[in-house]
């Protein structure tokens, strides 16, 4: 088990998975292997669909999310075992019983009224922390950058003459160059001139009090909450809503899937497809009348 788990985790490291994610992978794979050992298995080649199904039945989690997460990991591990010929049977990953049909969640985005309030906040607030807050939130809403990438912004990442931001995204290691809207540039400039402490740091956003330096944690989320307090009461209502809002607005402005992928730094189009649900205008064009399909509606209300 140790050799297989180590190889599997090394593969995930090469895919730039975070430490916390790797710990979850290790825990789930170890739990699966211990289950096999407890049931008398000392070789992956002996694994059968029946024992996989038994594992899925006995797995106990207090939440469906925890159970689903473990199954996603174990499925990936089973595919790894198949790929590297630890097992003799193919398709064992399909033997795990999910226990529930997939559900499409409603995408949470900022409303037009909330976007307007962000703009109004910018015009009426000018303390150092408020200037930092508005620059951070506008970067999220207008460029779609993740919180970790915003806090990692350095002076050399911004080309003021070309109005561009160029970074290597922390999550995907993708190099990306984005246009910097004028209002974003103005907000950053106002923060640098009137709000940022005179700190010897390469990072644009620094703490407002000594010791000055790069900020971490929930700084971006707290900035959003100070501007839109009601977001604090939204389940899962963190800073990532600004990225979803940015992607949705691109789609509403008739950007194509490839353009949105480039703007977000995504490699997989499936991660962008969920935003199509919010494009009411183009979704209506997909509808077909019953006459076109050859079906006739009889009777009435």
Language-model segment annotations:
Residues 3-106, 122-125, 199:
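N-terminal core-binding DNA-recognition domain of tyrosine recombinases/integrases
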Residues 143, 148, 152-186:
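Conserved tyrosine-mediated DNA breakage-rejoining catalytic core shared by Y-recombinases
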